[in-house]
Amino acid sequence: MSAVLSTENGLILKLYIQPKASRDQIVGLHGDELKVAITAPPVDGQANTHLVKFIAKQFRVAKSQVIIEKGELGRHKQIKVINPQQIPPEVTILLE
């Protein structure tokens, strides 16, 4: 499976998370996953909350449309984005 998979109602993203980064950004490919750097620390779910907020902003969807399907407690996550209004260029390249 590639880092980004298109489904009938959205996208499934396989992510590698880098917490406590200097800024929030989609870095690029990391093996067969998309690397995302976020500023939040991996403490008490702060990184997950921040990640959902960041992904929702990047894809212009509500936070409720970003679902962590796998990897709640680790760096390797699978996230579903339901009906994205916009797709960031870093992700568009992987869809082609």
Curated annotation (Swiss-Prot):
Pfam families: DUF167 (PF02594). GO terms for cellular component: cytoplasm. Belongs to the UPF0235 family. This is UPF0235 protein YPO0944/y3330/YP_3498. It comes from Yersinia pestis.
